[in-house]
A protein has these predicted regions:
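Active-site-adjacent structural elements in enzyme catalytic cores
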Residues: 1-208
Length: 208
């Protein structure tokens, strides 16, 4: 396992290491904005299966796809309606997972049972600029709490990855999950999980 910190060379070493790991089909441990996560290529079935094995998790549970570069999500944006596109512009990057319509059934391994819906994350920070989208989930054993510090990640998880990126201590808040699948058609949005983005910020961006 290779370990690299985000504070080395302004994050360049961490970004390059993450791109290399993902492109080779590896699994990476990385700092999100609130908690540590596990990541791999969202089209690599073997790598995704490894993540589920590391976590001891049911592989039928959906996961979000994370983007660290606007260019990486340009094809996805073309499929979005006007109101969802506006929501992206107002809320991302940020501590929020947006569930959006997925008419082309992109990333079916992340969507699992319902490929018509896709969870999307975009975060800022030292890893911003990584060219590849990431299949991502929290870096913890299933049903155990996620960690906001590199040192707090259990050895069973940290020792099972190909790359570990130390980003120091994070906020400890998971992303707020918001369903936008009915926003364009009915003007409706729903919070599925409270987290790092407040309801007030959501109302300001999306309306009531």
């Amino acid at each position: 396992m290779k370990t690299v910190a985000t504070d080395i060379q302004g994050g360049d070493a961490a970004r390059q290491a993450l791109e290399s790991c993902i492109s080779k089909g590896g699994v990476a441990l990385f700092p999100s904005d609130g908690i540590y996560g596990l990541a791999c290529d969202p089209l690599n079935e073997k790598a995704i299966a490894r993540i589920h094995e590391i976590k001891g998790r049911d592989d039928g549970k959906p996961s979000a796809v994370m983007y660290l570069s606007p260019l990486a999500m340009r094809d996805l944006i073309r499929d979005l309606g006007q109101r969802v596109s506006e929501a992206f512009a107002r809320l991302l990057p940020g501590p929020v997972t947006l569930i959006v319509p997925n008419p082309r059934h992109r990333y079916p391994l992340a969507c699992r049972e319902d490929p018509s819906r896709l969870g999307v994350r975009v975060i800022a920070g030292p890893l911003a600029g990584v060219r590849y989208p990431l299949f991502q989930t929290s870096a913890n054993l299933s049903a155990e709490p996620a960690s906001s510090s590199f040192a707090g990640i259990v050895p069973e998880v940290r020792g099972a990855v190909d790359l570990a990126i130390d980003g120091g201590r994070l906020t400890g808040l998971p992303s707020t999950v918001v369903d936008l699948t009915e926003l364009d058609e009915n003007g409706v949005w729903t919070v599925l999980r409270e987290g790092g983005m407040s309801r007030g910020d959501l109302v300001a961006a999306l309306g009531r």
